[in-house]
Regions:
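Acidic/His- and Gly-rich active-site-bordering loop/insert found
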Residues: 35-149, 170-177, 355
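Loop/turn elements at helix/coil->beta-strand transitions in domains of secreted/extracellular proteins
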Residues: 87, 114, 177, 208-210, ...
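Short beta-strand segments
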Residues: 119-120, 183, 213-215, 249-251
Length: 480
């Protein structure tokens, strides 16, 4: 622990110093027709310890209220960090004891503009310590990384938010528009006791907000250039598939395990689940996916024919990120849980399966028709969770501000839109008409399999990337 930072970290610090010098000369900047105060110095080094501290709060979300500790302890700590520098903080619990959320607003220079929501979730998925190189809730700082559950999903962004919010308030920095910092519960279970509850029960918290940024966007993907060398693409999330969790139920004739018959619920269910799990739904490239592949093709010279049945194979050229991209080319139905029986020698009357379905925008009816054909008449289905898809366009002043912020710190950057195969709290906020993007900037090592870290063993985030992201985000929030 506490090892010296590798060379890339020193480069980030040099970039930070040069930025500080520029900002120190100009304490004010004109954004549009409004003069706003800009930062003289962003304390980017602070983010490492803040993220480490956040990870040490065990905010595991099992998906069951009975076994989920909740986010309250962590949320109270976040609230204290903001109150300490003068924010009027609202702490509230969302639908169940211990499900803590924190909101704080920073007034901007132009009150006539819509506010910007910067949101992050405090909960994390479970982790088994025996499987990890370090304890998942240690927040260890080793080998140039901060380790632990939540390091990339998403206490990295939460840490950046805290550092920047404190710095802006302490330094008297006035952004161009109102900023609303939201730290919420239960994202890892669809937001039932978090963002969804807040939107349904406390819409006043989002009054005046027109746009939002959150997780799983703004990270770099290094690709080979067609003329030699490499290019860093920064993926801005502009779309998400819908999230539908489905329960399948087969009913059969119960009986003694020694006597075989043709109405075994377990057999019926297993056959249906196997058909569904092996099925590949049709390719339906969306606007965000087409724009992403077009941009990658321009840089690399790779050909991506979105009308080709072998588009999956072409996407494999992208390396580890191909897992996410391939999952956005079509609908998916992934069996994740099975339940049947209570004794070895008893044939059960029912058998159940749970399937995680992620569906492209506008595809729900067609998806349901395909599923019904696959599972057959002897298996019933029901949705246990249904959260919508969304897609926005890759344009406008906010996108321009993201691009400018990245270029200010990484002149070789290029921003590109992409679709997330998973889901975020943006699904809830979009219901209020808020235009949502994924923008949690990280400059990553080219050989880091970033997507494998989400919900993975030995989840970790580079120290350099945290400092880079804090600098980019601070620039963005003074020009948004």
């Amino acid at each position: 622990m506490g090892m010296p930072a590798p060379k890339p970290a020193r480069r980030v610090r040099r970039l930070a110093k040069s930025t500080r010098k520029r900002c120190a000369v100009a304490r004010a900047s004109v954004v549009g027709k409004v003069t706003v105060t800009v930062p003289a110095e962003t304390p980017i080094d602070d983010v490492v310890d803040v993220v480490s501290r956040l990870i040490r709060f065990d905010t595991t979300n099992t998906g069951e209220l009975e076994t989920t500790k909740g986010e309250a302890e962590c949320a109270h700590w976040v609230a204290a960090q903001l109150a300490d520098v003068g924010y009027q903080v609202e702490y509230l619990e969302s639908g169940a004891p211990g499900r803590g959320n924190v909101f704080a607003r920073l007034k901007g220079a132009d009150s006539s503009r819509g506010a910007l929501l910067i949101h992050g979730h405090l909960d994390v998925v479970p982790a088994e310590p025996a499987e990890w190189s370090v304890h998942p809730f240690s927040g260890a700082i080793e080998d140039g990384y901060v380790w632990g559950r939540g390091a990339v999903d998403m206490k990295d962004m939460v840490g950046m938010m805290i550092v920047i919010a404190r710095h802006f308030r302490r330094s008297g920095i006035v952004p161009p528009r109102d900023l609303v910092f939201a730290f919420v519960a239960d994202e890892e279970n669809g937001g039932k006791y978090g963002s969804q509850w807040l939107v349904d029960n406390r819409p006043d918290l989002f009054e005046g907000i027109t746009e939002a940024i959150g997780e799983v966007g703004g990270f770099s993907l290094t690709v080979p250039r067609r003329d030699g060398g490499e290019r860093r693409l920064y993926l801005i999330e502009t779309a998400e598939k819908s999230m539908h969790w489905m329960r399948l139920t087969a009913r059969g004739r119960p009986g003694h395990g020694s006597m075989v018959h043709d109405h075994n619920a377990v057999t019926t269910l297993a056959e249906a689940v196997a058909r569904l799990g092996r099925h590949r739904f049709p390719l339906v490239p969306t606007d965000s996916v087409v724009q992403f592949l077009t941009a990658v093709g321009e840089e690399t010279g790779f050909t991506f024919d979105t009308d080709s049945p072998d588009l999956d194979g072409a996407v494999e050229k992208l390396g580890p990120i191909a897992r996410i991209v391939k999952a956005t080319l079509r609908d998916t139905a992934n069996p994740t849980m099975l339940k049947a029986g209570y004794k070895t020698n008893v044939v059960p009357a029912t058998a159940e399966a749970v399937v995680d379905c992620r569906i492209l925008p506008g595809r729900l009816a067609a998806f349901e028709a395909e599923v019904d054909e696959l599972i057959g008449p002897d298996v019933t289905r029901e949705w246990t969770t249904s959260l919508p898809s969304y897609e926005t366009t890759f344009d406008g002043d906010l996108v321009d501000a993201m691009n400018a912020a990245l270029l200010a710190v990484d002149p070789d950057a290029r921003t590109v839109p992409y679709m997330l195969s998973g889901g975020t709290d943006a699904k809830a906020f979009e219901r209020l008409g808020i235009r949502c993007f994924g923008f949690a900037p990280l400059r990553l090592p080219p050989d880091l399999d970033f997507t494998a870290l989400f919900h993975g063993i030995d989840e970790r985030v580079p120290v350099d990337a945290l400092k880079f992201g804090t600098e980019v985000l601070a620039h963005f929030l003074t020009h948004c």
